[in-house]
């Protein structure tokens, strides 16, 4: 009787210790005897002791990968520093686990290569004014390339585009000159309107005096 009770307690402990609760927006990749068995979605699951193991816990939420600045060369041979932000989701936990050794390293390398290829076909001015187009091209290329890894790229953003200091200085001077030009135009238009209003006021006053 005591032996039976001990066995029951051990079985109960074994079951409890092998209960797994998968939270919302998560997935568990399960291996049985070293080989892929199944993928658990949200809910309560029981793992077979000694036979099954959780190979990987995967988040299904959108994730953000903020990569450090990468040196890139434009079509007109200007070297710039550009850092990218990639927003992605894991859509297939099995492929994500077994498709590639280090997914994040692979995404970073792929992002850098794709960015260099796109920027290499554009001149500096195009790079500075075509950010949305570059973002869109990168997203399409990265999404297609990462699909075999169980990853969907939702969007890509170029966070900073930093040309060489001498070009930055020239751009700042050009922007300052453009601001001053616009201010001068606005000032001249304001003075013109004021002069017109003053002339119209004097004209009306003269008419009133003549009528009197």
Which functions belong to the PLM regions below?
Residues 1-19:
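Single-pass alpha-helical transmembrane signal-anchor segments
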Residues 6-7, 23, 32, 66, ...:
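Hydrophobic alpha-helical segments and their boundary regions
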Residues 16-18, 125-131, 141-146, 184-186, ...:
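Short helix-to-loop capping/linker segments positioned immediately adjacent to catalytic or ligand/cofactor-binding
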Residues 22, 30-41, 45-178:
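Amphipathic, interface-forming alpha-helical segments with heptad-repeat character
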Residues 166-212:
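Long, charge-rich amphipathic alpha-helical coiled-coil "stalk/tentacle" segments
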